[in-house]
């Protein structure tokens, strides 16, 4: 026996606590640190993380934008930094390669690697979010990279996502979309697909197909949000849950008295010309709507309760109205808005004009219409678009971000990586940071 062992044994004789307490403490620290390491290890944790793990999780899952741009300064409104990013975008987009359908088909051959490489958040971040699942109806037809980035931005394991893929889309796009969805238990392609035509009934039917599938899922979601492939969130999932709870069971969408020029869209019978994929007005006037309220104007994007969605399929009057709308022009721009004012629909708002809601006041979608852009000091609702315009709608640029993140909407439309990918990259970085640092004021 060594001299030190002999001395230690002699000191411990008759002093059991003196010797066992340090050993017990050492054992406790060893086991405790081991479990702490496991709790903060993404490979071992599918549970809600402890607050002490959030920093290490963010380090592993951050989506810092590539290049030299400073997204934090851009989001905070640094006009010089935004200008540099816009100039950088002009140079980068000439040589940037957008991910193809084939790239995603290959990348998803190993789903675990795909989820890790693309930094999906595969665990719930709070009990509040876990107890308030959201359903998504995602209608897409092209640009697989934009769809996948949108999915990653809104993905949580407790939500449920239905993806409607246009039947007219190239086979490679459809395969890529199915490949991506196959990597998640709570993401699926709609059971019935439509050949969507702009301004036709089929655009509404695409959402209805997803709604029906979502009602049949095992997830007891509370609200439904519908999106398209050019949307991107400007709120985290936690922020959306907080806002949805504050609705107190009401829906949120644009719903206003329509301008006169829009009324012909539902006053006349329209036909879809299959050879040209265009909607054509006939001389046949339609019978009045079966609803006991006037027709209201809105848009395709809505935030509605589960009970509202269920009533679309079971309320007799709502079903008659849906049938009545099938031969009209762009029914998505008035059907939801009108049903929202029907007293038998859950979460409705009264039909009186005092309850009219503009797209600015609704939370569903932030859109900049070219005709309304201008100097806000002179009464314009928003500043000019810094990207470009498509169908009179702003395709956002980096310079729009500071204004955008100060709005209350859940999503903004439109985005396109071919127009300004820096805008999307900075939003990705901003949202991921806020997700793991919810109490910080980043903007």
UniProtKB/Swiss-Prot annotation:
Its EC number is 2.4.1.102, 2.4.1.148, 2.4.1.150. It is an enzyme of class 2 (transferase). The chain crosses the membrane at residues 16-33. Pathway: Protein modification; protein glycosylation. One of its GO terms (molecular function) is N-acetyllactosaminide beta-1,6-N-acetylglucosaminyltransferase activity. Residues 1-15 are cytoplasmic. Keywords: Disulfide bond, Glycoprotein, Glycosyltransferase, Golgi apparatus, Membrane, Signal-anchor, Transferase, Transmembrane, Transmembrane helix. Its main location: Golgi. InterPro entries: Glyco_trans_14. It is found in: Golgi apparatus membrane. Glycans are attached at residues 62, 106. Residues 34-443 are lumenal. GO terms for cellular component: Golgi membrane. It catalyses: a 3-O-[beta-D-galactosyl-(1->3)-N-acetyl-alpha-D-galactosaminyl]-L-seryl-[protein] + UDP-N-acetyl-alpha-D-glucosamine = 3-O-{beta-D-galactosyl-(1->3)-[N-acetyl-beta-D-glucosaminyl-(1->6)]-N-acetyl-alpha-D-galactosaminyl}-L-seryl-[protein] + UDP + H(+); a 3-O-[beta-D-galactosyl-(1->3)-N-acetyl-alpha-D-galactosaminyl]-L-threonyl-[protein] + UDP-N-acetyl-alpha-D-glucosamine = a 3-O-{beta-D-galactosyl-(1->3)-[N-acetyl-beta-D-glucosaminyl-(1->6)]-N-acetyl-alpha-D-galactosaminyl}-L-threonyl-[protein] + UDP + H(+); a beta-D-Gal-(1->4)-beta-D-GlcNAc-(1->3)-beta-D-Gal-(1->4)-beta-D-GlcNAc derivative + UDP-N-acetyl-alpha-D-glucosamine = a beta-D-Gal-(1->4)-beta-D-GlcNAc-(1->3)-[beta-D-GlcNAc-(1->6)]-beta-D-Gal-(1->4)-N-acetyl-beta-D-glucosaminyl derivative + UDP + H(+); 3-O-[N-acetyl-beta-D-glucosaminyl-(1->3)-N-acetyl-alpha-D-galactosaminyl]-L-seryl-[protein] + UDP-N-acetyl-alpha-D-glucosamine = 3-O-[N-acetyl-beta-D-glucosaminyl-(1->3)-[N-acetyl-beta-D-glucosaminyl-(1->6)]-N-acetyl-alpha-D-galactosaminyl]-L-seryl-[protein] + UDP + H(+). GO terms for biological process: protein glycosylation. It is a single-pass type II membrane protein. Disulfide bonds join 71-228, 162-385, 183-210, 394-426. Pfam families: Branch. Glycosyltransferase that can synthesize all known mucin beta 6 N-acetylglucosaminides. Mediates core 2 and core 4 O-glycan branching, 2 important steps in mucin-type biosynthesis. Also has I-branching enzyme activity by converting linear into branched poly-N-acetyllactosaminoglycans. Belongs to the glycosyltransferase 14 family. This is Beta-1,3-galactosyl-O-glycosyl-glycoprotein beta-1,6-N-acetylglucosaminyltransferase 3. It comes from Xenopus laevis. The lineage of its organism: Eukaryota, Metazoa, Chordata, Craniata, Vertebrata.
């Amino acid at each position: 026996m060594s001299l030190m062992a002999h001395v230690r044994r002699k000191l411990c004789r008759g002093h059991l606590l003196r010797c066992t307490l340090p050993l017990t403490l050492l054992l406790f620290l060893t086991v405790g640190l081991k479990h702490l390491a496991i709790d903060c290890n993404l490979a071992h944790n599918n549970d809600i993380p402890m607050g002490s793990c959030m920093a290490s999780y963010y380090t592993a899952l951050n989506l810092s934008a590539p290049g030299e741009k400073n997204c934090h300064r851009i989001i905070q409104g640094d006009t010089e930094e935004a200008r540099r990013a816009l100039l950088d975008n002009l140079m980068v987009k000439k040589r940037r390669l957008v991910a193809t359908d084939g790239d995603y088909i290959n990348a998803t051959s190993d789903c675990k690697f795909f989820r890790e490489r693309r930094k999906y958040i595969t665990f719930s971040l709070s009990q509040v979010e876990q107890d308030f699942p959201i359903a998504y109806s995602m209608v897409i037809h092209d640009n697989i990279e934009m769809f996948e980035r949108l999915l990653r931005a809104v993905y949580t394991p407790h939500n449920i996502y239905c993806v409607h893929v246009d039947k007219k889309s190239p086979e490679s796009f459809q395969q890529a979309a199915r490949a991506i969805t196959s990597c998640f238990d709570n993401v699926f392609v709609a059971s019935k697909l439509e050949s969507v035509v702009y301004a036709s009934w089929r655009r509404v039917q695409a959402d209805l197909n997803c709604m029906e599938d979502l009602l049949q899922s095992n997830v007891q979601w509370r609200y439904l949000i519908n999106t398209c492939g050019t949307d991107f969130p400007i709120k985290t999932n936690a922020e959306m849950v907080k806002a949805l709870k504050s609705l107190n069971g009401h829906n949120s969408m644009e719903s206003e008295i329509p301008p006169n020029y829009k009324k012909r869209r539902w006053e006349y019978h329209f036909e879809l010309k299959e050879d040209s994929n265009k909607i054509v007005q006939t001389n046949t006037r339609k019978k009045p709507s079966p609803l006991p309220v006037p027709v209201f104007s809105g848009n395709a994007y809505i935030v509605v309760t589960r009970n509202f969605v269920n009533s679309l399929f079971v309320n007799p009057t709502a079903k008659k109205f849906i049938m009545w709308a099938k031969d009209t022009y762009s029914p998505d721009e008035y059907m939801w808005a009108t049903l929202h004012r029907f007293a038998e629909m859950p979460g409705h708002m009264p039909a009186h004009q005092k309850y009219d809601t503009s797209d600015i006041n609704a939370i569903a979608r932030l859109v900049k219409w070219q005709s309304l852009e201008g100097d806000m000091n002179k009464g314009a609702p928003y500043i000019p678009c810094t990207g470009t315009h498509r169908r009179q709608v702003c395709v956002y640029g980096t310079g729009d971000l500071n204004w955008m993140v100060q709005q209350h909407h859940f999503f903004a439309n439109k985005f396109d990586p071919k127009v300004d990918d820096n805008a999307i990259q900075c939003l990705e970085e901003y949202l991921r940071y806020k997700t793991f640092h919810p109490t910080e004021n980043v903007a």
